[in-house]
Amino acid sequence: MAQNDTLIKGWQPVIGLEVHVQLMTNTKLFSPAKNQFGEDANTLVDLIDLGLPGVLPVLNEGAMKQGIKFGLATNAKIAETMIFDRKNYFYPDLPKGYQITQLHYPIVRDGVVEVNGKKIRIHQAHLEEDAGKSIHDKYDDKLSLIHISEPTRP
């Protein structure tokens, strides 16, 4: 397709991708629990991961630094203030009933990655914790289990 061609007169296709990356930090994004892959289900869990009353999340400084490094590497604008949002939804694999994310105020905006001479725009990059993981059909076809070690991974 030539640069000025369009599929339908007056329209040009634009494709966007949402890419999820798990950061290699020692601990989870808002929890002191270890952030290790491949461990048995529900062995790396802290009270913060479960959302028990009275527990308060603390941001993982290493994850924040990795986000800033990504912004610098992509020549992006780095947020001067870190603001997180509480995205409420109810899934069995989200024990708190909400996910902490940077929905409205991401750590990085307007970056660029060059690939084969073409500039690919990075609209934003934000930090957010993972939800849990539902496990279906592993032990019984009538039973679903929840892997709680996943929540709050950066």
Locations of the language-model features?
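Basic, nucleic-acid-interacting segments
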Residues: 2-145, 149
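Short "domain-exit" segments at the C-terminal end of structured domains
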Residues: 150-154
